[in-house]
Amino acid sequence: GRFAGFPSAGYAVLAIEIHGLEPSRENIGAVHWTEPDSSILFFREVQDGVLNDIHELGKENPYHYIHRRSLLAVMRAMDYLHARKDIDKDRIALFGGSQGGGLSLIAAAIDKRARAVIATVPGFCDQTAWLYGRCGGADRLKGGDREQIIEAMSYYDAALAAQLIDVPVYIGVGFIDATCHPTKVYAAFNNLAGPRTIENFINIAHGSPPGWRERSIEWLDKQFMMGR
């Protein structure tokens, strides 16, 4: 699974699915099923229906944007962890990739209970890059008011939020990533206010190389001074 290795390393994992779907069904459209059951058909229908163009929903208003709900979900997850007696509140980290990586950065800027962040090929970085001659972001303008979208997306830009993050951050960036472009990820990394480390995935697109999870755990151990 996505978090294999963390429990055996001594970390409790709370995985949230921000859209209310099972994590195992995230990429249901990319899976070929010979005999899809009713559950699989449901998730496929949702992906092609209500969750189609999910990142565009409400994009003209920061209070109506779909990922306001996502960030609230992260903060409610933090509330839950802080309500448990078996969790060390001083060693809570946010971990995510792509959409989850960008949201982890934004959430850490808002919720100071996060003590470290690991973001793999994070999204939501440098949302208006195209305004300054950098790649990415221009497609966000399709089907909406230009100025309203630019203003609303500034509330959900991980590169802008990064300047509010003063806890340690570990970022992985794919150098041939056409989804979360490396220039955008570096815009976030360069704005981080606290200790920061970045690993360049030279020949990797939108993903991570073998051993990335193990290195992430090692990095987290160092931040939290976890002895093995």
How would you describe each model-predicted region?
Residues 101-148, 200, 208-211:
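Hydrolase active-site cap/lid region
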Residues 146-161:
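Active-site nucleophile elbow and catalytic-triad environment of alpha/beta-hydrolase enzymes
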Residues 164-165, 171-173:
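Short beta-strand/loop motif that positions the catalytic acidic residue
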Residues 175-180, 206-207:
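Acidic catalytic loop of the alpha/beta-hydrolase fold
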Residues 186-228:
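C-terminal catalytic histidine-bearing segment of alpha/beta-hydrolase fold enzymes
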